[in-house]
């Protein structure tokens, strides 16, 4: 495994000649309840990327620690950048790696709020620069709840010394927006509105309107049970992408008739 930030330029030169694939981890610095560190998303993204890089030999770029998190802005310590700035920055980082020989960029994303912008970045790389790019969330489907039991368990697995379980809370989400009744996060029946976390929870533990999110039952063992099989699955996928001819992963021209 190679963390790009830990090698010299001469080592990097050799590295890019030997491997045309890179992992670009990204997350956020935002509140994750009173018990989890603000860096939860980017810390998990970095740790997961390292685990996959260790197994596949794919270079891991430095983690991008700040993303699209303005909806958590009322909680002290949360940092964010506007979506257009984030898109431009992520594209620029990816293209910098490509200037040294990367042809496949795998964006390992730890924060759901980044996803729409990252899909646009991946599309631009594939469409405009002949670079295959894909976006992966750094946790498997079914890990629901912001700062809930599963995410907290993942934190305990990767960096338990940063988690303060004595502060963990179980939080039932608010369902009221003034006189109106919410039917989901940011939903009023068939209508959606731009919500902030504070609309739903005073603690930052978040799930869905009217839903109780539990964080007090989190354990390191649960985190290992979540991330162990998922790591194996992603390792197999990354190895297949690494072995593929990048030109075969690009869009094909339309052949009329």
Place the predicted regions along the sequence by residue.
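Extended, histidine- and acidic-residue-enriched regions that form the cofactor-binding/catalytic faces
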Residues: 1-104, 112-257
């Amino acid at each position: 495994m190679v963390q790009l930030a830990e090698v010299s330029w001469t080592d990097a030169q050799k590295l890019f000649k030997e491997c045309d694939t890179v992992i670009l981890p990204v997350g956020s610095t935002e509140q994750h309840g009173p018990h989890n560190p603000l860096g939860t998303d980017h810390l998990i993204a970095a740790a997961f990327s390292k685990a996959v890089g260790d197994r596949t030999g794919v270079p891991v770029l430095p983690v991008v620690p700040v993303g699209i998190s303005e909806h958590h802005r009322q909680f002290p310590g949360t940092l964010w950048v506007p979506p257009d700035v984030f898109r431009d920055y992520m594209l620029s980082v990816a293209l910098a790696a490509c200037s040294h020989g990367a042809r496949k960029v795998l964006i390992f994303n730890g924060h759901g709020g980044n996803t729409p912008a990252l899909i646009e970045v991946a599309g631009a790389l594939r469409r405009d620069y002949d670079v295959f790019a894909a976006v992966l969330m750094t946790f498997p489907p079914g890990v629901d709840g912001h700062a809930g039991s599963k995410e907290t368990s993942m934190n305990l697995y990767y960096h338990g010394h940063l988690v303060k379980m004595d502060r963990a809370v179980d939080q039932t989400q608010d369902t009221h927006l003034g006189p109106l009744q919410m039917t989901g996060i940011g939903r009023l029946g068939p209508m959606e509105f731009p919500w902030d976390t504070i609309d739903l929870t005073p603690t930052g533990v978040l799930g869905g309107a009217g839903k109780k999110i539990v964080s007090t039952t989190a354990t390191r063992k649960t985190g290992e049970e979540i991330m162990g099989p998922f790591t194996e699955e992603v390792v197999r996928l990354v190895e297949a992408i690494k072995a593929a001819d990048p030109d075969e992963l690009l869009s094909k021209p339309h052949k009329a008739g």
